[in-house]
Amino acid sequence: MANSLYQKHIISIPELSREELELIVETAGNLKKEPRPELIKNKVVASCFFEPSTRTRLSFETAIQRIGGDVIGFDNDGNTSLAKKGETLSDSVQVISSYVDAFVMRHPQEGAARLASEFSNGVPVINAGDGANQHPTQTLLDLYTIAETQGRLDNLNVAFVGDLKYGRTVHSLTQALAKFNNIRFYFVAPDALAMPEYICEELDEAGIEYSLHTEMEAVIPELDILYMTRVQKERFDESEYAHIKSAYILTAALLKGARENLKVLHPLPRVDEITTDVDKTPHAYYFQQAQNGVYARQALLALVLNETL
């Protein structure tokens, strides 16, 4: 099938249409059921991580190799000429892009992926995270996981819990789900970490229902998806952190009134916001969610590098 993602830069979720998101989700499901180990045979993909990463880098590199591609690159730029010789990001991108067919990049600077796309000489750039800005491939694996567990991406009640102010994963996933029909959001956070105003304004403009909460227990029975995030200790003094942290810990006991189909997701790593007794419940799905990153990234790479599949 022809696809509009061929040779497209993947920089942010708002730039992807509902149809493109559905195509990625469908392709990920197909690749999970039936591996295709030669989809990007003879293609070379750069995996350039200018800040440390574990899950995203390993997931991407596994995805590349499992569909037949070769990978070059680095993790943490401390030993590269960019760091040691003062080379600009734009120069690095121009050189590296001349070696490869696609360019996967994580960078601590917001907007770095967009900048890279302007200097990649037409080689598609895939944003693996640029500061607190966007992390689109995390959103793609989240969407695939939701579709896999619920059988749909329309008609869902979804709660985000914890750090909604700084968590780029919840911003991107909210924007993605807003493209679907009859989605209701529950934003559960302390006032200091509430969902940014611009996200709420986007939902208001689109006529999408959402509600703000400071406690999660009351909303759990309403949910299809409960998306937990880590409250970042470094943003609070010790006493304030201890109070906030204790209000946003999910236990198995809190899930007793949950719908049978509820799945608990988390972008990982978790610290103590989900207790280990939740792992044994049928609602826990965060480790399978992480595994799905390989399939979602396989699908994205295959679609970006092939005009038809």
Curated annotation (Swiss-Prot):
Q: Does the keyword Membrane apply?
A: no
Q: Which residues form a coiled coil?
A: none
Q: What Enzyme Commission number(s) appear in the record?
A: 2.1.3.2
A Gene Ontology biological process in which this protein takes part is: 'de novo' pyrimidine nucleobase biosynthetic process
Write down the InterPro entries for this protein, in alphabetical order.
Asp/Orn_carbamoyltranf_P-bd, Asp/Orn_carbamoylTrfase, Asp/Orn_carbamoylTrfase_sf, Asp_carbamoyltransf, Asp_carbamoyltransf_Asp/Orn-bd
**Residue positions binding L-aspartate:** 85, 168, 230
The answer, when asked if Disulfide bond is one of the entry's keywords, is no
Give Gene Ontology CC terms.
cytosol
Relate the assembly described in the record: Heterododecamer (2C3:3R2) of six catalytic PyrB chains organized as two trimers (C3), and six regulatory PyrI chains organized as three dimers (R2).
Q: What does this protein do?
A: Catalyzes the condensation of carbamoyl phosphate and aspartate to form carbamoyl aspartate and inorganic phosphate, the committed step in the de novo pyrimidine nucleotide biosynthesis pathway.
* Record's protein name: Aspartate carbamoyltransferase catalytic subunit
Record the organism.
Vibrio parahaemolyticus serotype O3:K6 (strain RIMD 2210633)
Gene behind the chain: pyrB
